[in-house]
Amino acid sequence: FHDAKRDGMRLETSTYAEITAKPLANGEKIPTLREYIAVSQQYPQTKLIIDVKTHQDPERTRAVFCATDKVVKELNYESKVEYLIGYLPLYKEFSAMTDRPIAYLGRWMVELPEMHPDTIAAYGIKYLDYQDVHYEAHPEWVERFKADQIHLNAWTVNTEESMDFYLTNEFDYITTDYPTLLLQKCSK
């Protein structure tokens, strides 16, 4: 589940029982991380990208990351996991806690200075996961990130023109709502 709220409840301050009292639109409940990993283990080619949400309290964000990483390690699933974080002040700390790749998500509606290549270099970030509009507004950043050997993902790429841009620029990952179209473009 991706949103900060569900049926008016803030997820970060609600219990799992409260959150799952009403099923999702498809009739399922929101799975636990352990349940999600159990299903993922049935598909060896799958890489699990875990988005550690930024909470209002940085201590809570830290606790969520630690608990998440603990479960991943307990289930011996580290080789199949990458993390996303959107809170730059905790990036270095989290990176020191795991050898798993951690991508910086950027701040969704704020462009500078956090997302500038100089800031990324200063933090030693090697994985980026930015909204497509930021790369498209600054194609020179793509060149710089590539020169700095930074692993790139763009989201959410939904037009053919945008898909062509990211394929031409050899992005490592492209997040889209139209995977069939993207796969067709990849096979050309």
Where are the language model's segments positioned?
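Metal-dependent phosphodiesterase/phospholipase catalytic core, i.e.
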Residues: 1-101, 130-133, 146-148
